[in-house]
Amino acid sequence: MQFRTVLDVKVVDVEKRRNPSKHYVYLINVTYSDSTSHIIYRRYSKFFDLQMQILDKFPIEGGQKDPKKRIIPFLPGKILFRRSHVRDVAMKRLRFIDDYCRALVRLPPQISQSEEVLRFFETKPDDINPPVEDYGSKRKSGLDSSEPMVLEQYVVVANYERQENSEISLKAGETVDVIEKSESGWWFVSTAEEQGWVPATYLDSQSGTRDDLDLGTSRSGEVTKRRKAHLKRLDRRWTLGGIVNRQQSREEKYVSVQAYASQGKDEIGFEKGVTVEVIQKNLEGWWYIRYQGKEGWAPASYLKKLKDDLSPRKKTLTGPVEIIGNIMEISNLLNKKAVSEKDIQTDGEATTPERHISKSEISLPMPYAPEAGVAPTVVTALGMNSGSSATLQENKSRAEPGSPAIARVAPHRVEIGSPNLRQKPPPRRDANLAFQLPKPPEAPTVEAEYYTIAEFQSSISDGISFRGGQKADVIEKNSGGWWYVQIGDTEGWAPSSYIDKRKKPNLSRRTSTLTRPKVPPPAPPVKKQDSEEGPSLGGSASKAPESPQRVYEEPEYDVPALGFDSELDCNPPKPKTHNSPKPEPRKFEIKSNPAAAERIAQAGKASPLLKVMTSPLRKRNSLENINKEEVIYENEGFRFSSDDFASGCDSHTPRSLTLGRKPFGSSSGGGKPLRKVSPDLNRSHSLGRAERHSSKLFSDESARNPKREPVMRKDVEIRIGQSPLARPKPVVRPKPLLTKSEPQSPERMDISSIRRHLRPTGSLRQGAIRAMRGEDSETASVVSSEDSTSSRSTSDLSSVYSKGSRGGESDHESVLFRTTDAYERAQESELSFPAGVEVEVLEKQESGWWFVRWGSDEGWVPTFYLEPIKHTHNVGIQESRDSPLVDLGSTNKSNSLEKNEQRVQALNNLNQQNLRSMSNPSPPIPSKPPGGFSKPTAMLNGSSVRMRNGVRQAAVRPQSVFVSPPQPLKETNIHTGSLRRNESLGAGDHLRSTGGVRRNSSFTAVRPQPVTDVRVRAGTTITAPAGSSSPLIAQRNGIPISTVRPKPIEKMQLIHNNLREVYVSIADYRGDEETMGFSEGTSLEVLEKNPNGWWYCQVLDGLQGRKGWVPSNYLERKK
């Protein structure tokens, strides 16, 4: 081979060749590097072989490892089920092969000058002296040559369900293209979507004739032969064998390969291995045969040609031989004249006295007696002698079906086998169908569209690049795996593996949950509530009061509520008006006896404690409509009085409580509703021990702020779900880690995040501050007063922790804070700052993260790194333990209570720090979210986050608060008995003689007294019986606070207690690699308490005390 390269290639034309078989070659003008050019001739199969060689030799350039790196051009795929050796197909391929050749020679030299490419374009002897064929007068015009290219179309006459994988299902009225006809009666057809085998008896020609179903000869001595060599690789029986119409007029003899029992009067049964004479063949799978002097129909797949019958046939081939290259050309035989100039290779023609079969004769329906099972309906002759013709004429005159006719097939007879095995015959055609069938309806169309499923970057000139999810219009499908599509205004070839089909979406059903965030966003703004759903367990819904204001219903998400198996509604949120029907309340599965559950549900309808969690946007004049409820307190629990369960609530008051509105967010994203969940809430699982003592409660809520929503309503749902008779096991583990407030996307932005952009001014800001303040009570405090001065650190912490989270008391409250330590941000939305700089607080959230501005930078920072520059509140408290009944309408008392609460939380935070600094180092706090509530924050670096200081854990605060008289650090070892759960340890204040706030202690039974007037802050419920000395503030997150005086705690009692805190577990807990497991009733000593709800404890029951982190809501103070 001379070494010369190819400079240019151009495909100019196609040419038909008949040696060795009919095919087309492409005329290619090749320009070589030696400035010579030649015309070479290559057929498509040669291009295909070249492409395979190149792809095998250059896998990387062929895109086998990475499709994006493919530079080898694409070649049009092979045509497997259509005729490829026709001129029209060759002309369609010409443009693509020309592009392929041009791109191939422009590839890098290692490919374009490879041995395979040069050998392909090398001039061969056949290219210099191409074979010359004498076409004579065979082709007068190009029209005749393109006639066989069009596939015949048939209409499906009845529905057909596929029986095997190689078959396809059909629907009546559908139009199919017949690709291959088989003598077994199974045809290979193509629909708009798929190809496969179907019984021919389910198809009817669109022209109404059935002449194309039969194999026949119109002259004696002709041999009809089918060849489809290029499809042999599909491993199917593509050939039917030769059919000879001898001058001796002998019927062909076949041997039965399987026994057949006749199913009708016109059929012939036979045993296996017998010889039968085939009188007539057709392509529907049923042949007319003669056996033992009887004639009838038999399945063609049960018959096999006798081998000894082939030799005499060859000897008697004296007439012209007609070679038909494709089964589709058989239909042309009956449409031609006596001599077809197109396909005859010899001009010899024999004449016989045998008559020719006309087209009209083939299509005539045959009469048949109605009592017959299945009748032949079409006469089709297949080159028979005069004796056979006489037999047919004689059979026509009889009423019995003896004529060789195509039996119409009953579609319901679907005992079919595999088209590959061809053992079972196809169903017979029903006589009633015949040609009296009405015109079948149009095929049903299913509106579908194509779309891209991934991004694709094309590296070829006629390719197309696209992104995932784009709509694509498929213009042409290529079997090689490349489709010509249009995306937008561009067209090009795209890999079919990147394109998928889907049903065209209906605009009225575009409520897919795919775009819904998996994490519920913060609660939306709540307008003035006119009505809320009644309790789901009670089954009674309250009627909405008449009000022109609209109520925005909370959206519901596919997130389960804490500790419940709820039936969640996936409907999007809809605005509710005062006259809109209430949705069905959500049902929860509460593990308790039904009676107890019902009592709790009914009590929840008007519980003042539950009303604390409902919207604070109520008018003061609604006080007159508030009913009385009895609440029982013992130790740390509460329970509704059973004698008042049936009282219900006024359906026309705004006191109707939403029990099934929305499960609060338990997710991995950490939205705002998620951070409202505290271990204090879980403590409520052990509430409600007895029903012996009760006290009357009144509640009222003032409408202050229209921009806040009481998300702690969801906490109340959990509390209601607990059993009132038995101590329930905790169903929710505490949240060990606070996930910070994420910067929200526009679709998830709520009113609290909008406040950062549109800060409230004037009275609106005051209302927001007051509303937030009323909702944010952290613990209830019953503090006997003795005025004492707290240290600066206590005051600072008090304002930061308690007052600061409320957003400030008034407009003149200081918004400037000073950083106490350096902080490095862990996310983009946070703000890093050094120690000792002044920052301006733009938004305060109770989650423990504030949005501040430092210079020109803004971002979220933890509150424990900030201290106020100017203090506006004094934490001095003046209150007597034996004071008379508190005037609940007094503003001074409310302020005093809030100051007490601030002091409690400040002392608690300070002492938490002291306690952790004094205690021994403990293992790292579990970083996983217990109960699946929150995604653990990945930023747990020790120095910057300061886990021991509660950073990122402000949303989950200590279980209970006991304010002991603070002691100097040096006296801590003396007053060890003053500590209760999460109590202060070594605060900077002096010891006071008054009692502190305690939650876990037993309360004295006090006779509840009715109170007629209630004046409280928005979002709180304060009730005091006669004889009580201290007002109570109900905690915002739902922890019940006793309304009676606590048992006095004397100074000596506090002193004589030791530092050792022993708790007992109230339920079994399975530990893991980060936490310690224990069984119910295990005694544990608390070594360290973390405000996020995890306590570091030591087991006291075993010989070797195990240590580890345990959830605090599984523990109860050992009495």
Swiss-Prot record:
Q: Please report the stretch or stretches of sequence annotated as the SH3 domain.
A: 149-208, 249-308, 445-504, 812-871, 1058-1119
Q: Where is the composition biased (Low complexity)?
A: 779-802
**Per the record, which residues fall in region Disordered?**
388-429, 494-595, 641-815, 914-941, 957-1004
Query: Where in this chain does the record put each PX domain?
Result: 4-128
Q: Which domain of life is it from?
A: Eukaryota
Cross-referenced SUPFAM superfamilies, in alphabetical order?
PX domain, SH3-domain
Q: What is this protein called?
A: SH3 and PX domain-containing protein 2A
Query: What PTMs does it carry?
Result: Tyrosine phosphorylated.
The residue ranges flagged as biased composition, category Basic and acidic residues, are: 581-590, 688-718, 806-815
Q: What is known of its domains?
A: The PX domain is required for podosome localization because of its ability to bind phosphatidylinositol 3-phosphate (PtdIns(3)P) and phosphatidylinositol 3,4-bisphosphate (PtdIns(3,4)P2) and, to a lesser extent, phosphatidylinositol 4-phosphate (PtdIns(4)P), phosphatidylinositol 5-phosphate (PtdIns(5)P), and phosphatidylinositol 3,5-bisphosphate (PtdIns(3,5)P2). Binds to the third intramolecular SH3 domain.
Query: Which intervals of the chain form a coiled coil?
Result: none
State the organism of origin: Danio rerio
- Molecular-function GO terms, alphabetical: phosphatidylinositol binding; superoxide-generating NADPH oxidase activator activity
Gene3D superfamilies noted in UniProt: Phox-like domain (3.30.1520.10), SH3 Domains (2.30.30.40)
Principal location class: cytoplasm
Q: Of which family is this protein a member? A: Belongs to the SH3PXD2 family.
Task performed by this protein: Adapter protein involved in invadopodia and podosome formation and extracellular matrix degradation.
The subcellular localization recorded is: Cytoplasm; Cell projection, Podosome
Could you list this entry's UniProt keywords, alphabetically sorted.
Answer: Cell junction, Cell projection, Cytoplasm, Phosphoprotein, Repeat, SH3 domain
GO CC terms of this entry? anchoring junction; cell projection; cytoplasm; podosome
Its GO biological process annotations read: neural crest cell migration; reactive oxygen species metabolic process; superoxide anion generation; superoxide metabolic process
UniProt-listed InterPro entries:
NADPH_Oxidase/PX-Domain, PX_dom, PX_dom_sf, SH3-like_dom_sf, SH3_domain, SH3PXD2_PX, SH3PXD2A_SH3_1, SH3PXD2A_SH3_2
Q: Which SMART domains match?
A: PX, SH3
